[in-house]
Amino acid sequence: MKSQEEVEVAGIKLCKAMSLGSVTFTDVAIDFSQDEWEWLNLAQRSLYKKVMLENYRNLVSVGLCISKPDVISLLEQEKDPWVIKGGMNRGLCPDLECVWVTKSLSLNQDIYEEKLPPAIIMERLKSYDLECSTLGKNWKCEDLFERELVNQKTHFRQETITHIDTLIEKRDHSNKSGTVFHLNTLSYIKQIFPMEERIFNFHTDKKSLKTHSVVKKHKQDRGEKKLLKCNDCEKIFSKISTLTLHQRIHTGEKPYECIECGKAFSQSAHLAQHQRIHTGEKPFECTECGKAFSQNAHLVQHQRVHTGEKPYQCKQCNKAFSQLAHLAQHQRVHTGEKPYECIECGKAFSDCSSLAHHRRIHTGKRPYECIDCGKAFRQNASLIRHRRYYHTGEKPFDCIDCGKAFTDHIGLIQHKRTHTGERPYKCNVCGKAFSHGSSLTVHQRIHTGEKPYECNICEKAFSHRGSLTLHQRVHTGEKPYECKECGKAFRQSTHLAHHQRIHTGEKPYECKECSKTFSQNAHLAQHQKIHTGEKPYECKECGKAFSQIAHLVQHQRVHTGEKPYECIECGKAFSDGSYLVQHQRLHSGKRPYECLECGKAFRQRASLICHQRCHTGEKPYECNVCGKAFSHRKSLTLHQRIHTGEKPYECKECSKAFSQVAHLTLHKRIHTGERPYECKECGKAFRQSVHLAHHQRIHTGESSVILSSALPYHQVL
């Protein structure tokens, strides 16, 4: 037995190894071949499962396990790692589970009472003679311990006894049995049991061994059978080789060192696998496509791409997977289980790889660097997507329905749902369904109010990491997505994708009601509300409802007076960002929207569309009260207020109300005295631009008749 001090030292070494991330699952795993598994009884198998799961959970608790091994997924589903082959009876016979060697000893010879050292006990055991009745040969116990008496296909096998660790049990003096040593297959004598003395014939392949001294069989209950125990942590193992590997966790021993990079391993198999990184060796080749792999397990998984085999099916939704680990991870969508928790912030994840990626947020580690531009990423998948998007242009994943290609498999899967309409992720609070799991996660934060992502500059919080990343570009001015056609840059890749459809003319989203097509799905969703009349976003101040949340936000600024968008040229502020963009074209003189009929150019696209109706005569907006039609939606809205009498714009100074915001703006200038329109000839200022235009005719000499006809009688000069 190790001293308490040695145990503590071993524990410190284990903690140190784990803190350095040097322990892998394979370091603490217990491996059985199918043959070995069939030899284990029920108690041993149960113990194996318990130890394996405990080892794995210990690693996960300190974040040292990246992906879940298939064997753990099986054990969590209470399945065996091996299926017992039919027609084979390879397990131990219940009556022959253990073979014990003993000798009738008097009380004064009792080994326990004498407290003899292990060396003396071994000497006494070596003195016992055994005779093989078939071969007619005498055996010393010393020889017996060093030979394999029975081959692997028989009831029991005994191998070399290397040393005796402990004598642990004292028996009553009245017990007839002496001290007994368990000769187990893993070469340790661990326990002392009382046994009834008798002669025992051991039959194996028609061979019989009988002892001249006393040999007995102990009918030990299967559930109490002991395996090898680690003295440091008391974990149980079935093989000496597995125990030896396990003990290297406590000692930190890594005897197998790579001569290329100096990295050391606790197992030779791990070294051999690691060396393929340096040699580039990929000995396992796919016969279908020729792709090679460094590990056979990777080849087996890859081959399912060709066969389409998905042997692991979810019992909840019948979705099938090619890998057991993927099924186990998927099932957590249904259960909501998130067993992997970040020790820094407490955030939990459904798989340990997501936890590993998340922890890099805290550490700032970005181990995957692009060889073309030097940009670094936290995940290898992000690097692969980056290179395909910016450098190689590769889009290896094609949609079989429409032929559209994607840079990654996830993009293809998500795209396919636009064809199938599948929305497998359902909110358990409101029942809303989503095509992407990430969309469900973000949606659920509406119910919880959670905003875990905070800007370190302005402290604004967001419910989605992507929203924070996009927001931070407002501070940095970064626009990493540039159009190759016109050079225009964007903060978001989706904005670039939408913009590129201007050049391609692509409008992939079609309305099923009127067949109108759109370049963006969001525009289609907005359009469909015209048919449904849906206006789900209501103002709490005045009760006005809107079909889009952006319109509600913009409307609420009428009540708050907020104008967060300021022109850097003149300081004028606006309630909407689009208004600022349009206003800035006054300073730049830019008119990017040109009519193909007459060549007239406009600052706003909406103005061009409205103008084109002059050529076409189109009046798509009709009043449902009087039938009058309009070429502009805004004109219809203003007209309808004649019927309703609605005057939603009220002056805060005198409470006078107006049907149009422009009328309110003009009225406010009476109170403020503001006259923003100044004549460059004489300096006279006016509240309205139309008044300035009329005044300027005095200087140009235009007919006063025109002026008088244009103004009400009392305004004629």
From Swiss-Prot:
Protein name (database record): Zinc finger protein 470
Stretches annotated zinc finger (C2H2-type): 228-250, 256-278, 284-306, 312-334, 340-362, 368-391, 397-419, 425-447, 453-475, 481-503, 509-531, 537-559, 565-587, 593-615, 621-643, 649-671, 677-699
Tissue specificity note: Highly expressed in testis. Very low expression in thymus. No expression in other tissues tested. Expressed in a differentiation stage-specific manner in mesenchymal chondrogenic progenitor cells.
Subcellular location: Nucleus
GO biological process: regulation of transcription by RNA polymerase II
Domain named KRAB: residues: 23-94
Annotated keywords: DNA-binding, Metal-binding, Nucleus, Repeat, Transcription, Transcription regulation, Zinc, Zinc-finger
Keyword 4Fe-4S carried by entry: no
Motif interval(s): Nuclear localization signal: 216-219, 385-388
Zinc recorded as keyword: yes
One MF annotation (Gene Ontology) recorded for this entry: RNA polymerase II cis-regulatory region sequence-specific DNA binding
Pfam families reported in the protein's UniProt record: KRAB, zf-C2H2
Matches recorded under PROSITE patterns: KRAB, ZINC_FINGER_C2H2_1, ZINC_FINGER_C2H2_2
Biological role stated in the UniProt entry: May be involved in transcriptional regulation.
InterPro entries named among the record's database cross-references: KRAB, KRAB_dom_sf, Znf_C2H2-type, Znf_C2H2_sf, Znf_C2H2_type
Any Gene Ontology CC annotation: nucleoplasm
CDD domains assigned to the protein according to its UniProt record, in alphabetical order: KRAB_A-box (cd07765)
Record-stated family: Belongs to the krueppel C2H2-type zinc-finger protein family.
